[in-house]
């Protein structure tokens, strides 16, 4: 999968961009606050129809403009496709090959990207909510079914929590309606837990191999999926559904008392176990960075495994956060097979023998030009 051509209009600090890219490594070089991250963000938005930096789409529109447009020509094994997003103050419109998509869910999955930014180095020690977002964003790209189940689960979770609050404050008393919401939540929750268990197991295997390679066999790594359902049941969605139903029944009184759902995949987490210890609590900073790198590289392998194609990789000023050994391992792992966009203020310090002939672009005050 490659991004061949990108067109921006009124996006962040870019009035207009129209450029083609190398199918291998593209380096965006420039001083801070010139628009390097904005350009990477636009590629991310083209793929996922949302920003990783803000939940307010209006921030993507250039100051004083009515709309922002992001358009790209993407090459896949199935052929070349034009993707386009128009972001206005009224909302978003998405097109594939100039055909408007009635739902954003029908647009997603046509262009897959993986972003690696400095904040991702903290994924192993960050919050469970951050790790769930990470899982959902990546797995949703790989599987329309996962994305659908996640969307449905969030809808019913919101409705159920609102109804639990009504029950708590005696504004409602119909427990039959609560049972209907609970059953829907258990059904979609079971699908999510089963999918997460399967994908995390595969991803863990990839990450374990990468961790061993980086550390020359000194460190073992595996993922420990933390969910309320017994591990022996997670491979069967019907058994997970039954288990969730039983847990909801046991917790119903407490849930009404607290006005929120206490059961379900919204409480999941993933622990990263290095040499039999939780690296977040017991690992050194070096081990945590190695683990974060292994996790991100495992994402690439998992996406290739699930979709049949490598995603596009976005490296936002992350090389400066890695020492020479980790930097070399990252660049060797992606060399020639993964189209990569990386931002930097200088080519100094980058392993030049690894990226001997990159396409270099100069970013300066919202303009982009070949260097």
Curated annotation (Swiss-Prot):
InterPro entries, per the entry: DNA-binding_RecF (IPR001238), DNA-binding_RecF_CS (IPR018078), P-loop_NTPase (IPR027417), RecF/RecN/SMC_N (IPR003395), RecF_2 (IPR042174)
A cellular-component GO term for this protein: cytoplasm
Tagged with keyword Cell division: no
Residues that bind ATP: 30-37
One Pfam family it belongs to: SMC_N
Coiled coil: none
Gene Ontology biological-process annotations: DNA replication; DNA synthesis involved in DNA repair; double-strand break repair; SOS response
GO molecular function list: ATP binding; single-stranded DNA binding
Claim: Nucleotide-binding is one of the keywords in the record: yes
Major site of localization recorded for this protein: cytoplasm
Domain of life: Bacteria
PROSITE patterns in the cross-refs: RECF_1, RECF_2
Localization annotation: Cytoplasm
Function field: The RecF protein is involved in DNA metabolism; it is required for DNA replication and normal SOS inducibility. RecF binds preferentially to single-stranded, linear DNA. It also seems to bind ATP.
Cross-referenced NCBIfam families: recf (TIGR00611)
Family: Belongs to the RecF family.
UniProt name for this protein: DNA replication and repair protein RecF
Source organism (scientific name): Lacticaseibacillus paracasei (strain ATCC 334 / BCRC 17002 / CCUG 31169 / CIP 107868 / KCTC 3260 / NRRL B-441)
């Amino acid at each position: 999968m490659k991004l061949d051509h990108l067109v921006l209009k009124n996006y962040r600090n870019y009035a207009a961009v129209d450029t083609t890219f190398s199918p291998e490594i593209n380096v965006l070089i420039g001083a801070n606050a010139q628009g390097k991250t904005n350009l990477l963000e636009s590629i991310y938005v083209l793929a996922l129809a949302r920003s990783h930096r803000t939940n307010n789409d209006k921030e993507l529109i250039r100051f004083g403009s009515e709309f922002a447009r992001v358009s790209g020509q993407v090459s896949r094994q199935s052929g070349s496709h034009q993707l386009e997003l128009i972001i206005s103050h009224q909302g978003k419109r998405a097109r594939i090959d100039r055909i408007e998509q009635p739902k954003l869910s029908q647009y997603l999955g046509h262009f897959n990207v993986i972003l690696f930014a400095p904040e991702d180095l903290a994924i192993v020690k960050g919050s469970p909510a951050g790790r769930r977002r990470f899982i959902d964003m990546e797995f949703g790209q790989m599987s329309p079914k996962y994305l659908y189940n996640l969307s449905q689960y969030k809808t019913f979770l919101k409705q159920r929590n609102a109804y639990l609050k009504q029950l708590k404050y005696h504004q409602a008393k119909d427990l039959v309606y609560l049972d209907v919401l609970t059953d829907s939540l258990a059904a979609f929750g079971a699908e999510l837990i089963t999918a997460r268990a399967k994908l995390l197991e595969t991803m863990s295997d990839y990450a374990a191999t990468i961790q061993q390679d980086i550390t020359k066999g000194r460190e073992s790594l595996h993922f420990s999926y933390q969910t309320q359902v017994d591990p022996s049941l997670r491979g069967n969605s019907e058994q997970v559904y039954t288990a969730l139903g039983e847990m909801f029944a046991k917790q119903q009184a407490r849930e009404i008392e607290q006005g929120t759902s206490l059961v379900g995949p919204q409480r999941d987490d993933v622990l990263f176990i290095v040499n039999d210890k939780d690296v977040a609590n017991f690992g050194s900073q070096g081990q945590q960075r190695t683990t974060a790198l292994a996790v991100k590289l495992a994402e690439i392998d998992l996406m290739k495994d699930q979709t049949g194609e490598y995603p596009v990789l976005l490296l936002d000023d992350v090389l400066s956060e890695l020492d020479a050994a980790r930097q070399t391992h990252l660049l060797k792992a992606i060399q020639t097979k993964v189209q990569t966009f990386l931002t930097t203020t200088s080519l100094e310090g980058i392993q030049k023998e690894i990226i001997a002939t990159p396409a270099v672009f100069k970013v300066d005050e919202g303009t982009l030009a070949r260097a």
